[in-house]
């Protein structure tokens, strides 16, 4: 499998490898199968017992997740940036409203409910 641009960030490289795998019929038939594979990889991560095994399984989870994004026709880089911004905005909301008596989890849920994500 030849991926020409070795300067791409790992997220983009993985996405490109997944697309190439599809052309070689080394891919799942549909989104549901790709999602099942992701869940399987998450379970393997959960069951791993050593740090090295956990790291290896985490890489597999990332790779499978990027494959799921391909089935959704979602650019993983863009979707990750959106999620990061959502987290930052919600964290700012929590930071702005926190006091000694306030439960952070309650504020977080409030931020989610009020769509504090853009």
Where are these regions (language model features)?
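Short, small-residue-biased leader/transition segments that mark boundaries at the very start
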Residues: 1-3
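AMP-binding/adenylate-forming domain of the ANL superfamily
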Residues: 5-18, 36
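Generic structural signal for hydrophobic core residues of well-folded globular domains
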Residues: 18-21, 65-69, 111
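Active-site flanking loop/helix segments enriched in acidic
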Residues: 20-33
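An amphipathic alpha-helical micro-motif enriched in hydrophobic residues
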Residues: 34-87, 91
């Amino acid at each position: 499998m030849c991926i020409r641009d070795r300067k791409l960030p790992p997220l983009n490289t993985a996405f490109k490898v997944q697309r190439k795998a599809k052309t070689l019929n080394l891919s799942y038939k549909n989104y549901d199968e790709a999602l099942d594979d992701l869940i399987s990889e998450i379970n393997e991560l959960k069951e791993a017992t050593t740090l090295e095994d956990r790291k290896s399984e985490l890489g597999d989870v990332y790779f499978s997740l990027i494959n799921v994004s391909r089935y959704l026709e979602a650019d993983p880089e863009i979707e990750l940036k959106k999620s990061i911004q959502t987290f930052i905005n919600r964290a700012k909301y929590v930071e702005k409203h926190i006091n000694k008596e306030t439960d952070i989890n309650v504020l977080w849920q409030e931020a989610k409910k009020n769509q504090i994500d853009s």
